[in-house]
């Protein structure tokens, strides 16, 4: 089917209007009209080929909210008119043990990314949510619950599930002591979600200027990581620290903050980490772990949780033709805390 959107054609060029062919729907597919598309920092990395695996032309976008406009003959979960959401995956083998556990993000045979990935059947490169339509296997679409604001829901499909998944994996709830390093797109969601789960939440920041923002998002306090006395007083005071910082940084100041059996989980940095001292880990039975996104079942759980608890990302709405300006602002950390494209603006941008 004919579709259109915005694409990166080269690492050095801005995104431009792009017309392309979506694959024909299969019997178990739903076709979505995209209403809102979140702008993830990984979209910028992929457009600029920072990770050296981008295939051009690239249509980014893996935080997608839309309306079903067509269903395949075997589809049972959705009907035309339903509001659905799609995140970072559009397929997996659905046969391995990980898929059987509802952890398609850890598929033994590799999941299919929403964009810049080979289709499991044809090998064609997938194209993402900066576009008019999406064709997706029904198992990889989540239902938008009643009461969840469609215009603000899109970032839940990446920033939301990326932080929700480790909070659930490490059983965060009332009485849990959670630290969050970084207060950007991921960090602000980690704070909101952990607070909604009943945890005591502390934002760890190099700047005291983040205090007002941290408290407004639901944190109980701010810990200044450059304050040696405050950091010493906070030793052994966290069960879980969620590290959302997207660049290489030193973990040594944070490991002593974990209590016995505590975990620092990395969700923001993709690539080499700084070396860190293993002594605090050995002496305190502490752990450093990583966590990607969650599976489809957990993503649906997140959407239902956010509807029930009224947890939504803080977003700035933009038009499609403002995407290059948004990318520039993201590089300057000039957004609180996530851009969302109103895809109704797409046609006027062509």
Where are these regions (language model features)?
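N-terminal Rossmann-fold NAD(P) dinucleotide-binding loop
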Residues: 187-188
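Glycine-rich beta-strand-centered segment in the early N-terminal region that forms part
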Residues: 23-37, 50-100, 105, 127, ...
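Adenosine-nucleotide cofactor-binding segment
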Residues: 174-183, 193-253
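Short glycine-centered segments of the SAM/dcSAM-binding site in methyltransferase folds
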Residues: 83, 177, 262-263, 287
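Helix-to-beta-strand junctions that scaffold the AdoMet/dcAdoMet cofactor pocket
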Residues: 258-259
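Rossmann-fold dehydrogenase core element
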Residues: 263-265, 276-316
């Amino acid at each position: 089917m004919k579709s259109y959107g915005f694409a990166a054609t080269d690492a050095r060029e801005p995104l431009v209007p792009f017309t392309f062919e979506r694959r024909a729907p299969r019997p178990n597919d739903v076709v979505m009209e995209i209403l809102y598309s979140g702008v993830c920092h990984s979209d910028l990395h992929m457009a600029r080929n920072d990770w050296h695996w981008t295939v051009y032309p690239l249509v980014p976008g893996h935080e997608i909210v839309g309306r079903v406009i067509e269903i395949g003959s075997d589809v049972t979960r959705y009907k035309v008119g339903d509001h659905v959401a799609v995140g970072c995956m559009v397929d997996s083998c659905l046969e391995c043990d990980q898929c059987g556990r509802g952890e398609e993000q850890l598929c033994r045979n590799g999941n299919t990314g929403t964009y810049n990935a080979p289709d499991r059947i044809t090998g064609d490169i997938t194209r993402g949510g900066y576009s008019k339509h999406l064709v997706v296997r029904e198992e990889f679409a989540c239902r938008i619950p009643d009461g969840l604001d469609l215009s603000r829901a899109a970032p839940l499909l990446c920033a939301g599930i990326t932080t929700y998944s480790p909070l659930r994996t490490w059983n965060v709830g009332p009485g849990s002591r959670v630290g969050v390093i970084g207060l950007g797109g991921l960090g602000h969601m980690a704070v909101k979600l952990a607070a909604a789960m009943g945890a005591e939440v502390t934002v760890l920041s190099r700047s005291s200027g983040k205090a007002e923002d941290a408290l407004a998002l639901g944190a109980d306090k701010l810990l200044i990581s450059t304050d040696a006395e405050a950091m010493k007083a906070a030793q052994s005071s966290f069960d879980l620290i969620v590290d959302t910082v997207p660049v290489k940084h030193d973990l040594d100041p944070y490991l002593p903050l974990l209590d016995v059996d505590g975990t620092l989980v990395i969700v923001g940095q993709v690539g080499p980490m700084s070396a860190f001292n293993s002594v605090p880990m050995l002496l305190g039975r502490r752990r450093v772990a990583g966590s990607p996104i969650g599976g489809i079942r957990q993503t649906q759980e997140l959407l239902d949780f956010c509807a029930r608890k009224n947890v939504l990302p803080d977003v700035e709405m933009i038009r499609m033709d403002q995407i290059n300006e948004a990318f520039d602002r993201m590089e300057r950390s000039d957004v609180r805390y996530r851009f969302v494209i109103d895809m109704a603006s797409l046609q006027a941008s062509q």
